């Protein structure tokens, strides 16, 4: 196991046997038991002064600057436009340990890990993909899920809030051949986001990038690209995406003096691994409600 210079110093202090036990020898129940003892001991030692000091200084604990009364109407409009195909899901704030690493491609130090062997949700698309995979494995042919959830991340050296409200859609379906499933899912998601851009985010637009030439031709024939800016894949490779997308992806951009990206979406291979079925196709998409709200003010001015 590789670690940081700081963690290497700590491992040297506690010794090889403790390291081996914590990393490998203890089973999950034993490890949770030990960590629970650590948490109880540390919590008992805290004083009210410690609590308020941590609240003032720890960026992970700081409230967002967004007033909930400003987010509620935006979230309501996002829900009102969701197609009937989608089932609403209320996710836990926790997800399986390793979701950020194996689904989002994030390092474990960029998510909040709990002492109970779980992690705090960093992207609702991860939780929806896990739930969609569970439903697909129990016999559902096509699964379309929607949610909004407060997500927390541990970005270092950032002035932004460590948590945000995100609204997400996830679709999982079996491969129909000829990229027909991919085209169907893109139609479903992009129709929704086109409507949202027209009603919720007045100056918003969708930028679509397609890396598969066959799919690009199919989308053009179906009219999927209507009202959408299409970006050549080679011109978009240097811009980072929120998740490791394949085949096709899209961004939601608000025009202004400095264009602002408020969300994105694309095809992922998550459900293929989670369902152990290489024929599964999964499309995810979402926006940061925190990022969207200021642009709804601009539209009202």
Locate each region found by the language model:
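Extended accessory regions or peripheral subdomains of proteins
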Residues: 151-229, 239-240, 246-249
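A translation/RNA-centric and nucleic-acid-associated enzymatic feature enriched
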Residues: 2-31, 218-301
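Hydrophobic faces of well-ordered beta-strands that scaffold small-molecule active sites
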Residues: 89, 144-148, 167, 208, ...
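Class II aminoacyl-tRNA synthetase-like tRNA-binding/catalytic domains
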Residues: 2-162
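Short, hydrophobic beta-strand segments
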Residues: 55-61, 167-172, 253-255
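Catalytic cores of large soluble enzymes that bind and process phosphate-bearing ligands
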Residues: 63-70, 119-122, 178-181, 185-188, ...
């Amino acid at each position: 196991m590789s670690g940081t210079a700081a963690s290497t110093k700590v491992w040297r202090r506690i010794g090889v046997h403790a390291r081996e036990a914590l990393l490998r020898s203890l089973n999950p129940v034993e490890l949770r038991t030990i960590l629970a003892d650590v948490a109880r001991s540390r919590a008992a030692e805290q004083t009210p002064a410690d609590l308020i000091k941590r609240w003032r200084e720890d960026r992970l604990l700081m409230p967002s600057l967004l007033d909930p009364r400003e987010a509620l109407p935006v979230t309501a409009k996002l829900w009102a436009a969701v197609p009937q195909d989608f089932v609403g899901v209320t996710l836990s704030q926790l997800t399986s340990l390793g979701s950020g690493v194996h689904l989002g491609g994030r390092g474990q130090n960029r998510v909040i890990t709990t002492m109970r062997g779980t992690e705090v949700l960093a992207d609702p698309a991860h939780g929806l993909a896990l739930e969609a995979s569970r439903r697909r494995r129990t016999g559902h042919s096509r699964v379309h899920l929607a949610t909004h959830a407060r997500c927390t991340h541990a970005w270092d050296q950032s002035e932004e809030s460590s948590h945000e409200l995100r609204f997400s859609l996830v679709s999982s379906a079996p491969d129909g051949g000829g990229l027909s499933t991919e085209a169907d899912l893109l139609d479903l998601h992009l129709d929704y986001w086109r409507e949202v851009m027209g009603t919720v985010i007045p100056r918003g637009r969708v930028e679509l990038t397609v890396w598969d030439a066959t799919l690009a031709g199919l989308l053009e024939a179906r009219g999927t690209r209507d009202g959408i800016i299409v970006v050549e894949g080679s011109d978009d490779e240097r811009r980072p995406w929120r998740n490791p997308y394949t085949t096709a992806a899209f961004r939601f951009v608000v025009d202004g003096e400095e264009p602002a990206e408020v969300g994105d979406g694309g095809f992922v291979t998550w459900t293929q691994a989670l369902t152990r079925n290489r024929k599964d196709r999964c499309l995810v998409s979402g926006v940061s409600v925190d990022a969207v709200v200021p642009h709804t003010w601009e539209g009202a001015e």
